[in-house]
Amino acid sequence: MSIRFIIGRAGAGKTRACLEAIRKELLARPYGPPLILLVPEQATFQIEYALAATPGLSGFIRARVLSFRRLAYRVLREVGGAARAHIGELGKRMVLRRLLEQRRSELRVLGRSSGRPGFADTLARTLGEMKTYCIGPDELARAAFDLREKGGAALLADKLEDLAKLCFDLEDYLAGRFTDPDDYLNLLADCLELSAEVRGTEVWVDGFSGFTPQEYRVLAALARTASRVNITLCADPAALSGKIDETSLFFPVRETYDRLLKMALQERIPLERPLILGGNTARFKSPAISHLEKYFFVRPAPPCLNCSEGVVLAAAANPKAEAEGVAREITALCRDRGYRYRDIVILLRDVDSYAGLISSIFADHGIPVFIDQKRPVMHHPMVELVRSALEAVTEDWAFDPVFRYLKTDLVPLSREEVDLLENYVLAHGIRGSRWTDGRPWEYRRELTLEEDPGLNGSESVELEKVNRIRHQATADLLEFCRSFMQAKNVREMSTALFNLLTGLKVPEQLESWSRQAEKEGRLEAAREHSLVWSGFTALLDQVVEALGDEVLEPGEYAAVIDAGLESLRLGLIPPGLDQVLVASLERSRNPEMRAAFVMGVNDGVLPARTFDQGIFSDLERERLKAAGLELAPGGRRKFFEEQYLVYIALTRSSERIYLSYPLADGEGRALMPSPIVARVKELLPDVEERVWPVEPNAALLDDLEFVTGPRRTLSYLASQMREFKAGRRIDPLWWDVYSWFAAGEMREHCKRVLSGLFHSNREDRLPPAVSMALYGRPLRASVSGLEKFRACPFAHFLSYGLKLKERAIFKLDAPDLGRFFHAALKLFGDRVREQGLDWGQLDREQCQEMAGEVVDLLAPRLSSEILLSTARRRYLTGKLRRTVQRAALVLAEHSRRSKFRPVGLELSFGPDGDLPAPVFTLADGSEMAVSGRIDRIEAAPSDEGVYLRIIDFKSGKVTVKLTDIYHGLKLQLLAYLDVALEHARTLTGGNGLPGAVLYFRIDDPLVNTDGPVPPGEEVEREILKKLRMTGLVLADPKAVRLMDAGLDGISDLIPVQIKADGSFAARSAVLTREQFALLRSYLRFQLASAGSEIIGGTVEIAPYRKGRYRSCQSCPFRPVCQFDLLVDGNVYRSIKDEDEGAIWSKLGRMCRKGWGQ
C-alpha cells in the first residue's frame, strides 16, 4: 500500500499520464487484477470513451472508470449493505417536509422558514452537507451548547439545535428501513477493506481539486487496501511547499495536498516519490494559451508579443448574436481547418442561461451539440399528464387541467375530437359534477331567449358525438378519480396513479415515440422518452418508500408529486460520437480538446460574485470552523475558488480559445466585459479582437463568414435581399449564394422564404363565381353587415362570406347582455299591451314588479343558465333586474311627457320578417334584400300625418355624427326609419313623417354629489339627464313638444335645447324635414353601393382610423388578416370629423348628380 502524487499545472499531462499507465497495463496483461480510475461523476463517460479509443485496444475488462458514489455501490453490492432499500434525494425531501411540519412549533429559527418555497430543498442540502463533512446530531447539539456557554451567538446556537432535532428525527425515521445515499461513502470507507475486488488493485484518482471529509475517509481506506493510489493534483509544484497566500490560485489544492499528507501520516501509509510533470508541451500547441496558463494569475507578468495566435476576444450585441457568432466560428473551424465537432467544447459559467439559445441556433446551423446538463422533465407530455390528472381531481374537474390532460396525446383521442369536446365545454361552462354524474350532456347555446323549441336533427347528431367523445376521454380519468379519492394512504394513491398510466398504455406510447425519434435522428429526444418513464416510476417508488403509510389529503399528495417532478432531472449521455460539447466550468473534465469557446465572459458572471449561502452565513461558517465543525467553504472562500474556474476555462484547449461576451442582455440592459478580458489584453497586446454582428456587415466581418449551414444561410440571404430591395448595396457573394439555392435541392424552400420580400398583404377581388357561391343571388344583407363592410371589407368577408366566428365561451359578455335587455324590454312591452295598460300610466311599483317578473323568467334561458351558475352571477341577476326596472321607469316617464306611443317592439323586416325587406337593384342588375330588427317604433299623430320615431336600445353610450353616416359607419337608425316610413300605413294607418332617430341607453347610473344626498326627486331628475337619448330629431317645435310636452330650455329626454325666442340652440341635434329626406336618399345609395361592391368581390384589408379609435381594436379577425402598418400595403383609411355644413354641401351635390350617376 502506498500513495503517489502526480503533480503538474494545467496541460502538463496528468490525465494523459493516468490513461497511459492504464493502457500500458491493459495491453501488457489484459486479464490481470482490476485497475480503478476514480474521476468526478460527470467525467466518467468522457474518460471511459478516451480509454476505449486506445489504438490496438479492442476492449477491456480490467479497467473501471468510476465515481466515488459508483465505487460505493459496487463494493456494497459485493460485501453486503446494498440490499436495504435506499431513499433517494426526492424521497428524503418528502420526509423532511413531513418532519418540518411535525416539528414546526418546536423549531426556534427553522420553524419560521418551513413554509417558504424551496426551504425543504435548502434544508436537505444542509443536512447532506453535514453528512458529507461527517457531522452528526450529537456534534450539532454539543456545538450549540458550547456556543451558548460562550455567549454572543444565540441565533447560530438556535439553528444548530433545530438542525440537531431534525437530524435525530431523520435518522430515527430511516433507521432499519432505508439507506441514506449521503451515507454511502461512510459505508464504503467502513467496508472497503473487505472487498476482494479492490484489494491489491492500483487506483488512479484524477480530476479533483479537493475532497470532502467522507472522500478523505474513502481515500484512506483505499490506500490501506489497494497496492497503490495515484492522486493527481493540478498545481504548480512550487506551490506545494513553503508558505502560500490564501488568495493564491493554487491555495485550495495546497490545502488538499497538506490534508492528504496528514492522512497518510496518521494512517502510516508510505508516500512514493511524486511524479512531477513540468512544462506545457503535453497539451498546449499555442504559445499564447501557454502564456495565459503560466502568467494569468502572476503579477507583475511579462506580455507576450507577437504570439497571440490561438486566442480570440469577441464582443456581440446580445447573447443571441454571441451564440450565432460561436456557431459561425465552429463551422469555419470544421470546414476550413479540419476540426471535428468532438474537438470543440463550449464552456459556460451558467449553462441554463445559454442552453436554449445554443440548442435552437446550432440546429439552424446544422451543428450537432450535446449540452451536459441534467434535463428537467416538466415539459414532457407524460409529466403533464400526471400533473393535470391530479389537478383535475383535486380542483373539481376545472377546464384547464382536464384539457391539459386530454392534449398530451397520451389519451386515446384524436386532436380533432379533443377540439370538438373543448369547444362544447367552453361554450357551456362544464366542470365539476357535470363531468362525473354520468348524465348525457344536452346543453345548447341559445341564440334567442324565446321558449326552447327542442332539439333538431343536426343538434341531436352533434350531441351524440360529443357524449361519445366525452365517455372515451374520461373513462380512465373517472376510474382514477374514484380509486384516488377512496385511497386510504399514500401507497394506495400512488397505485391509483400508476394504474392510470398503465391503463392508458403510456409506457408503450413512450417506447413508440422513442423509436420514431430515433428514426428521425433526434437521438436526445429518443433517450428522453425512454428515461422519463423510469424516472417517474423511481419517483413513485421513493414516495411510497418514504410516505407509504402516511395519510395525506389529495391536494397534499398532488403537491408532493408536483415537487418531486419539478426536481426530477434526466441525466443523458452524448448520443453521438461527433458532437460539440457544451458544459459548465464546474463540471468540465474533458480531455484533449483542440478548441474551447468560453461564452458569457461578463463582469459578475465569470468570475461569479454571488453565491447561495444556504442556512449558514459566511460568518457563521467561520465560527463553526473555529468551534471544530468544518463545513463547505462559504461565499468568501468560493469567490477565491472562482479563480480556479477561470484557470480551468483558459486551459481546456490545446490550440484555440475564444473568449466572448455580450454587450447587453436579452432585454437590452447594458453588460460590462469581465476583468478577464482586460487581463488577456495586458498579457497578449496583439490579441485578435472581433465583433460578431447580428446580420452580415462587411465593416465588421467578412460576409463569407455568414455562409454556414443551408438553413441559417438562407435566412441571412433573405435579409440581404431585403437590403437590396431597399436600394442598398450588398456583397456580390450573396448573388452566388442565391444561385446555389436556386439551382439546388432547396430551391422550393428558397422560393418560399424569399417570397416574403414581396409580400404586400393585399387581397385581390374575388372572382365572380366565388362571390356568387359565397353570397348567392339575390344578395341577402343586414344593415349591421353593410356597416361592417364600410368599416373594413375584409372583416365583412370573413364574417359574412366565410362565416368565421369566434368560438363560444361560457361567459357573460356585451352581446349576451344586449340580447337580454332587448328580450326583457320586449317582454315588458308585450305585458303592458296584454294587460291593456298605457306606458304613461305605469307607476314605480308596477315597473319594478313587472321588470322583476320579466328578469326572473328570462334569466334561466340566457346561455345555458349562466346567470344561475355562480354566486357572483346570481348577484349580477339582481343588478340586471334593477337596470331593466330603471329602463322601464324612464320609458314610462317618456310616455307621460310625450304623445309618442309604441307601435312596434322588436319588429323584424326582411324575408320571413314582420315587414317586407327593402330591395335594392345593384350595379350588375341583381337585387339585394336587406333585413334587420327595429327595437322600438313609436308614433304620435299630428295634423299633417303621423310622426314616427325610432328608438334603438344600447347598453353603452352611443352618439350619432353626420360624419359616420356619410362614411357608411352608422346607418342602422336611418335604415330603420326608412323602413318604418315606407310601411307607416301598415303600422299606424296614417301618412308617416320622420320624427326622430334615437339611441336609448339601458343603464342604472349612479349620481355623484359633493354634499349631502339630494332629495329623491332631484336624484331622479339627474338620472334622467344621464339617460337622455341621443340621436337626431326633426327640427319642428310641434314635433319636439310631442316628445317633451313641458320642454323649456334643455330637455331631460331628448337631445334638444330651445332658446327663449323659440328657436333651437346650436347644441340641439335637429334636422329639417328636407335633411331627413336627403339622408334617406343617401342611405339608399350607400346600401346599394355597398351591396354592389360586395357582389363585385371587394375584400380589401382596409380598416379605418378616426381620432384615437381604430376599427381593428375590437375586431376578432386580426390574427387572420395580419394587418400591420410595417407591411407594404397596410394603411388605415383616415376618417376625420368634418364640418357638418361641408358634408351637407357634398350630399347636396351628389344628390343633384344622381348619386354618382
Curated annotation (Swiss-Prot):
ATP binds at G8, R9, A10, G11, A12, G13, K14, T15. Its EC number is 3.1.-.-. The keyword Cytoplasm does not apply. It is an enzyme of class 3 (hydrolase). Keywords: 4Fe-4S, ATP-binding, DNA damage, DNA repair, DNA-binding, Exonuclease, Helicase, Hydrolase, Iron, Iron-sulfur, Metal-binding, Nuclease, Nucleotide-binding. Residues 1-299 form the UvrD-like helicase ATP-binding domain. PROSITE patterns: UVRD_HELICASE_ATP_BIND (PS51198), UVRD_HELICASE_CTER (PS51217). InterPro entries: ADDB_N (IPR049035), DNA_helicase_suAddB (IPR014140), DNA_helicase_UvrD-like_C (IPR014017), P-loop_NTPase (IPR027417), PDDEXK-like_dom_sf (IPR011604), PDDEXK_AddAB-type (IPR038726). Residues 279-590 form the UvrD-like helicase C-terminal domain. The keyword DNA damage applies. GO terms for molecular function: 4 iron, 4 sulfur cluster binding; 5'-3' exonuclease activity; ATP binding; double-stranded DNA binding; helicase activity; metal ion binding. Despite having conserved helicase domains, this subunit does not have helicase activity. PANTHER family: RECBCD ENZYME SUBUNIT RECC. This is ATP-dependent helicase/deoxyribonuclease subunit B. It comes from Pelotomaculum thermopropionicum (strain DSM 13744 / JCM 10971 / SI). The lineage of its organism: Bacteria, Bacillati, Bacillota, Clostridia, Eubacteriales.
